[in-house]
Amino acid sequence: MSKVFTLNSDFKPAGDQPEAIRRLKEGLEDGLAHQTLLGVTGSGKTFTIANVIADLNRPTMMLAPNKTLAAQLYGEMKEFFPDNAVEYFVSYYDYYQPEAYVPSSDTFIEKDASVNEHIEQMRLSATKALLERRDVIVVASVSAIYGLGDPDLYLKMMLHLTQGMLIDQRAILRRLAELQYSRNDQAFQRGTFRVRGEVIDIFPAESDEIALRVELFDEEVERLSLFDPLTGHVLQTVPRYTIYPKTHYVTPRERILQAMEDIKVELADRRKVLLANDKLVEEQRLSQRTQFDLEMMNELGYCSGIENYSRYLSGRGPGEPPPTLFDYLPADGLLVIDESHVTVPQIGGMYRGDRARKETLVEYGFRLPSALDNRPMKFEEFEALAPQTIYVSATPGNYELEKSGGEVIDQVVRPTGLLDPLIEVRPVATQVDDLLSEIRQRAAVNERVLVTTLTKRMAEDLTEYLEEHGERVRYLHSDIDTVERVEIIRDLRLGEFDVLVGINLLREGLDMPEVSLVAILDADKEGFLRSERSLIQTIGRAARNLRGKAILYGDKITPSMAKAIGETERRREKQEAYNTEHGIVPQGLNKKISDILQLGQPTNRGKGRGNRKAAEPAARYELMTPKALELKIRELESKMLTHAQNLEFEEAAALRDELQALRAQFIAAS
């Protein structure tokens, strides 16, 4: 029997969690396609989902709206399931500029991208786990709806080696080259192999710490063993091993040759259309670019921008959806959409933006019309492909509610007994002076305040005003990158300052138990930032503090305010009733401040590791930008390989441990 999920936690489900777990499981077992979990801030939604996954033993994909929340989810799931395959699948681009054409200025912008190798390795590891195991949780961003290599071709290209099989060395090396592995007898790194006599060492593309040694005797595989690529220490011998391609986009030679013929046919048809419309420049440009791509594909098996021919390479018809990560998920897989009120609209919006850019490229002769089929999934295609789905949000959107038939599974009662914040509505006329008074009360007892305004100008003016009156205040705006944002949140929690002012301020995501007051200025101005869901999410930022309170400044109560206040009061009444019935005294959360910084730390799965760790140096890297972290990772990798080549294995192993901590920090930062 395949391995089951083993949930590792010191806690048992409490509050509304047992009932939510029971109802979700029953719904899934009864075949419900859509369920919605309405879980308030701090109610343990992730723990509830972890229990459902563990009980049902089904491979699961969890979608998050951005890399920060994906890294946070990945870290939490790693802790809950240390013995199972918890994988991370987000965009592997540190920087990405798609090709585009601006007709007004006759400017063509070439594609420019920087790929992060470590995240590429984690993506390959995720698809391998989905193909090989049942106990898999893949935490992904919306990157999951973008085109990926066809799983059928990917499986056909795999190289299976078993002990005792008859195969000569040349055949193995030829197959490795087809999988896009490169031979490197000097620097042994991911996606390479080396040959020493009748021994072939292969460093799998999806692995970060284990390599394969193939020992041949004449034309027979005598032994297969896994070893540490750094120290050369053999970890175990295995009866069989499967080597996966170095990239998801690998294609057999015969398919490439067939694709080239199809591209030539389309090019001839498109040239006729352009010439018939007197588009001579466009016709010449298209012919030149496409012929160059065809020559590259013939010689090398790929070309720059080969993804624009993906329709032919995967054998799809015009308009058919591209293969994506969803095609790798087993038929009985489970989909969990976190912060669904944000993630679902994101999925729907990806296709149109991509389409508009590509139509311009096709119209002006930079690409063939088939390039339009290199795209993310349409929303309808996502709906058709999605397995049984659980939507998770404190404020579910209309789509989720409609799909769930209006039924939501409430998770309102927190295991800690904490109540939703008290809400007060106060007049706008005196909002700034009233806020100053409230801030001083909170600062005196070492509590923090979040203030949300409607405009950037007002946020700047308010910050300046509070500073003039001696308050320790910072302003969070859109120009601040993810890493700096995490630093600001940490400084707020540490008490470096007392007030954080923003516009669309921290609605979903990182939580701060020290915040006891949320002030919403101009709450009576209906709009995107003052909608019912925005107000509930913002009010929820004070829900982890015993003295949590929200002040809405407005001269009238708008429909959105009325709904947000009504929903918060409903939750608070239910929480109070539960606490009274069970004799629970609310307890404030004491979340460690380091928790929000060390997101997605991979567990050390290696065997025979030394006790020397590199946590102390890693602490220095917390404030570095993703680019600086990447440069540091490359520098340490180079030093590590030098130590290994000089047989200084202790120093190399110490650097390897430091690299693991650095890579985890990089995931959190990017």
UniProtKB/Swiss-Prot annotation:
A motif (Beta-hairpin) lies at residues 92-115. Keywords: ATP-binding, Cytoplasm, DNA damage, DNA excision, DNA repair, Excision nuclease, Helicase, Hydrolase, Nucleotide-binding, SOS response. The keyword Mitochondrion does not apply. PROSITE patterns: HELICASE_ATP_BIND_1, HELICASE_CTER, UVR. Residues 431-597 form the Helicase C-terminal domain. It is found in: Cytoplasm. GO terms for biological process: nucleotide-excision repair; SOS response. GO terms for cellular component: cytoplasm; excinuclease repair complex. Residues 630-665 form the UVR domain. ATP binds at residues 39-46. The keyword NAD does not apply. CDD domains: DEXHc_UvrB, SF2_C_UvrB. It comes from the Bacteria. HAMAP family: UvrB. Forms a heterotetramer with UvrA during the search for lesions. Interacts with UvrC in an incision complex. NCBIfam families: PRK05298.1 (NF003673), uvrb (TIGR00631). Belongs to the UvrB family. This is UvrABC system protein B. It comes from Pectobacterium carotovorum subsp. carotovorum (strain PC1).
